[in-house]
Amino acid sequence: GNKMSKRLGNAVDPFDTIEKQGSDPLRWYMITNSQPWDNLKFDIAGVEEVKRKFFGTLYNTYSFFALYANIDNFKYAEAEVPFNERPEIDRWILSLLNSLIKEVTEAYEKYEPTRAGRAIQDFVIENLSNWYVRLSRKRYWGGEQTADKLSAYQTLYTCLETVSILSSPIAPFYMDRLFTDLNKVTGRYTTDVHLVDFPVANESMIDKQLEERMNMAQQISSMVLGLRRKVQI
């Protein structure tokens, strides 16, 4: 790519980009697209992709949760379902969430926001949305308030709330809105996302063997889908 220059007429108006795409998608793109010490090859299509894939996916995941939580009047008032009594799918995503907390905390402490943002993005798109919500959606449909359904609500709520806190240094406006919308009903926190304590990983919830087994299942599934597309079946 060429260096932006008024003389060459290839400069991008930042205010126009913010107006059209939003400041948080722009900030997320610039931070996750390249390391701070590397040159950034700016592409407006990349900002649009971040807005659609990451922020759009996170919004859709929250909207899915909010739809059924409102129907069932879920307010996180019930006692926590014990971790070891939750289904394996819940224990898997919570294990990944706590592994994510460790990785993101370490990245921020080492002034590596690029690594932090990429880890969060991968968790939201690949694991939380593509796998956890897709495999768990039927659990929210039933009319009865079972322990399994409560576990599903508590698990997804915890993931969304934690992601909003982890992401807030990079996307302060969007994540504060997400955090506020979540807590508007539950009242778990009375302040905004930027004043809460940063999450601390619960080592007892991290199960690397479970993460590896699920990762293998994801790879096998992706390979099978790829073969099906190849032979058009």
Where are these regions (language model features)?
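Core structural elements
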Residues: 31-33, 53-66, 87-100, 117-140, ...
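Short helix-adjacent coil turns
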Residues: 108-115
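Membrane-interfacial loop-to-helix junctions in multi-pass inner-membrane proteins
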Residues: 46-52, 112, 148-156
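Catalytic adenosine-cofactor/nucleotide-binding cores of aminoacyl-tRNA synthetases and other
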Residues: 2-84, 186-189, 229-233
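Acidic, turn-prone loop/beta-hairpin segments
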Residues: 72-102, 134-223, 231
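Long hydrophobic segments that form regular secondary structure
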Residues: 98, 112, 120, 227-230
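Generic beta-strand/beta-sheet core signal
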Residues: 2, 6-7, 29-31, 43, ...
